[in-house]
């Protein structure tokens, strides 16, 4: 299940995100928070000590029965900017960021996992007919 808190005026179709959530975590709730650039900067500064806005952050919760898997926070203005720059829909960019974030909630770590997260993202991109992922774009 997906719980969405859109704190921005930007609108999007979230149906594909429900499908992605059901594939990746069929028995767990995922919270998706859509924020402004400034809010993302504050969250990044407070949680990671990095004083800049980023595109997506993940906050896993402890593995306690009947609690959400965690929260994925997406910077909507940055997602919109990336979608325009890369020539695809905002919904696709949000889906890519969401996949990336949920994989982190599930324990994947592209900085340490020897390509496992990249492989899983690639599989999901094909399944949901999406453009290149964050990791794939970074490596191109």
Curated annotation (Swiss-Prot):
Keyword flag Acyltransferase: no
Enzyme Commission identifier(s): 3.1.-.-
Ligand binding (Zn(2+)): 100, 104, 110
Function: Single strand-specific metallo-endoribonuclease involved in late-stage 70S ribosome quality control and in maturation of the 3' terminus of the 16S rRNA.
Cofactor(s) recorded in Swiss-Prot or TrEMBL: Zn(2+)
Protein name (record): Endoribonuclease YbeY
Subcellular location: Cytoplasm
Cofactor note: Binds 1 zinc ion.
GO cellular component: cytoplasm
This protein's record includes keyword Acyltransferase: no
Keywords of the record: Cytoplasm, Endonuclease, Hydrolase, Metal-binding, Nuclease, Ribosome biogenesis, rRNA processing, Zinc
Protein's GO biological process: rRNA processing
Gene3D superfamilies membership: Metalloproteases ('zincins'), catalytic domain (3.40.390.30)
UniProt cross-references to NCBIfam families, sorted A to Z: rRNA maturation RNase YbeY
Primary location class: cytoplasm
Molecular function as annotated in GO: metalloendopeptidase activity; RNA endonuclease activity; zinc ion binding
Domain of life: Bacteria
Similarity comment: Belongs to the endoribonuclease YbeY family.
Signal peptide from the UniProt entry: none
């Amino acid at each position: 299940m997906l719980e969405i808190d859109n704190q921005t005026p930007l609108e999007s179709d979230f149906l594909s995100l429900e499908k992605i959530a059901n594939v990746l975590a069929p028995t767990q709730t995922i919270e998706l928070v859509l924020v402004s650039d400034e809010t993302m900067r504050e969250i990044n500064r407070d949680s990671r000590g990095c004083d800049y806005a980023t595109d997506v952050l993940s906050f896993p919760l402890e593995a306690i029965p009947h609690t959400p898997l965690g929260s994925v926070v997406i910077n909507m203005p940055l997602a919109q900017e990336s979608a325009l720059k890369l020539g695809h829909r905002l919904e696709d960019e949000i889906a890519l960021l969401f996949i990336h974030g949920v994989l982190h909630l599930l324990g994947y770590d592209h900085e340490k996992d020897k390509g496992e997260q990249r492989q899983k993202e690639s599989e999901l991109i094909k399944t949901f007919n999406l453009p290149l992922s964050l990791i794939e774009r970074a490596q191109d």
